[in-house]
């Protein structure tokens, strides 16, 4: 197993579709990598037009299954940098803004979503 910080340029015209796939649980249901990819994408950070997240992977080349199933559809210019641990990877990107805006609930029956 290897841990990577992933850097990828989102295809902006498909960003809402990716958000929908995350929200529906479609990505997390993919086996064997879905839960890890879902967690990474939900917590991804943005900087200078690129998304960054941490991914644990067993494939060679890295992210082969993830790219084939999800990433190549929604991102361009995908690169990886190996890190020693999950914690090290997230610490490197923690100060960047989140890729996704968070929900603000205003009542038990409604919420405001501040963009994707």
Annotated model-derived regions:
Residues 1-69, 89-116:
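Short S/T/G/P-rich N-terminal loop/turn motif that feeds into the first structured element of a domain
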């Amino acid at each position: 197993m290897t841990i990577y910080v992933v850097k990828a340029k989102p295809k902006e015209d498909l960003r809402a579709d990716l958000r929908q796939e995350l929200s529906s649980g479609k990505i997390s249901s993919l086996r064997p990598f879905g839960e890890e990819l879902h967690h990474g994408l939900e917590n991804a950070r943005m900087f200078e037009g690129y998304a960054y997240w941490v991914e644990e992977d067993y494939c060679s080349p890295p992210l082969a299954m993830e790219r084939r199933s999800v990433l190549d559809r929604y991102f361009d210019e995908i690169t990886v940098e190996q890190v020693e641990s999950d914690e090290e990877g997230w610490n490197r990107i923690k100060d960047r803004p989140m890729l996704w805006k968070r929900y603000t609930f205003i009542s038990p029956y409604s919420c405001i979503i501040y963009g994707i």
